[in-house]
Amino acid sequence: MNEAVSPGALSTLFTDARTHNGWRETPVSDETLREIYALMKWGPTSANCSPTRIVFIRTAEGKERLRPALSSGNLQKTLTAPVTAIVAWDSEFYERLPQLFPHGDARSWFTSSPQLAEETAFRNSSMQAAYLIVACRALGLDTGPMSGFDRQYVDDAFFAGSTLKSNLLINIGYGDSSKLFARLPRLSFEEACGLL
């Protein structure tokens, strides 16, 4: 049986964690990026489909390539972040299902319905992006997820000729707490949830 994590872990992962807009000049190693993926990949996806593909942009050249796609409000925070992850989804994720879900012919569920395949890929890559954020926090990193960018530009600049499509961007690094905004409220249980 699972045991609840410590209050300190809950604070790190959720209640005290913040979305960061400014960054300390501390690099994030490639080994740390591998550790992030090694954790996030275990989060559940539908039929273990694992549609997410990630490009970790760590270089000035990569950031300049990304720059034209960024909204003005996301420009500076992205250019100064040690890493920006392009979280994408593979529109042909089902080609890996014989490896990832060998219990039956799951591939045919999606090859027979392009709409189901697209919905599944997008929904599950969004879940995997959340796992990435939690994995970063668990390893002592901060994040700044963003949907304010030109997806078509990113797809053309980074994924042309492939089956990948961008979902969102996540800045990763060690946040500068002096640049945080005041904490915004969240909906209460009564406002967001129902009991039947």
From Swiss-Prot:
Q: Which cofactor does it need?
A: FMN
Signal peptide positions are none
* Group of enzyme by EC: oxidoreductase
Q: What induces it?
A: Up-regulated by the nitrogen regulatory protein C (NtrC also called GlnG) and repressed by RutR.
Q: Which reaction does it catalyse?
A: 3-hydroxypropanoate + NADP(+) = 3-oxopropanoate + NADPH + H(+)
The entry's function note states:
May reduce toxic product malonic semialdehyde to 3-hydroxypropionic acid, which is excreted.
> What NCBIfam families would the database entry show?
PRK05365.1
* Name listed for the protein in its UniProt record: Probable malonic semialdehyde reductase RutE
**Which organism was this protein described from?**
Escherichia coli O6:H1 (strain CFT073 / ATCC 700928 / UPEC)
Per the UniProt record, the lineage of the source organism begins with: Bacteria, Pseudomonadati, Pseudomonadota, Gammaproteobacteria, Enterobacterales
